[in-house]
Amino acid sequence: MLEAEKILITGVTGKIAFPIARALAEHNEVWGLARLRDPADRARLLDAGINPVAFDIGADDVAALPDDFTYVFHAAVDPGDGDWGRALTTNAERSGDLLYHCRAARGFVFCSTGSVYAYQGRRPLRESAPPGVPLRANYSFAKVAAEAVCTWVAKRHRIPLTIIRICSTYGPQGGVPADRLELMLAHKPIRLHPDRPNNYNPIYEDDYVELGIRAMEVAACPPIVVNWAGSETVSVEDYCAYMGELVGVEPIFEYTPDAHTPLWPDVTYMHEVLGRTKVGWRDGFRRMIAARHPEIPLT
């Protein structure tokens, strides 16, 4: 665990960045950047010991920020729901600007996504797998561009960088598995790709906090590019069936080629550079449900 460092966390109100910032704030000076349009977000950061900074990574000038951060975890993102040019500018160009501005840091983590990969069928995706354009095309190609920009900046200026390709996170803060739980509780269908089983490697909050911090510690030049996921593989079909057993609801699956293709990452390299995850998926899903729905008695 890092101690006595000055750390910048962007996108700090998000489900991934907030738990990491909260953990680091116990022994470090943590600055949390986000738009902070809701006063409740600022209060939540202050309660966690995080220094809140209202900042829009897509519009504000990074020159206004301090340049003496020792570590950076860059999770701010434009999801690409609107103009594709804006997504490209925010995710790629502004990330490069921030990386250069924080070039004195001993470790910089750029949050990419496993959705940069083209679907390869029912086999795990290694970091060398080719890119593709899944359903969220704007987001995916902007992240591919961002990886290229950040890699160039890091190599050019000898900045230690880790690019993590986030695959499937979940926990008390939420995540896609939590979204699927809500569909189950509402007795609504869960859309899945026909190429079943839909395999994933979900990573629980405790583990992604630990591996997120580890990613900052191992940052290097040339940059490390690594899948960021759980050590265990489980299909959506199996984990939804397990959640159904816990809450007493049968999942309804709707198979359609219009659904997201499965994202099944190869975690061999992750185990080498970041380590293995510790929370088994069954324990993690039970803990997620208990945290998000304490009113439901679990069987």
Predicted regions and their residues:
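Mid/C-terminal beta-alpha module of Rossmann-like enzyme folds, strongest
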Residues: 188, 211-214, 218-258, 266-267
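NAD(P)-dependent short-chain dehydrogenase/reductase
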Residues: 151-200, 205-207, 243
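Conserved Rossmann-fold NAD(P)-dependent oxidoreductase catalytic core, especially the SDR/UDP-sugar
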Residues: 96-138
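Conserved C-terminal active-site "lid" loop/helix of NAD(P)H-dependent oxidoreductases
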Residues: 205, 235-241, 255-287, 295-299
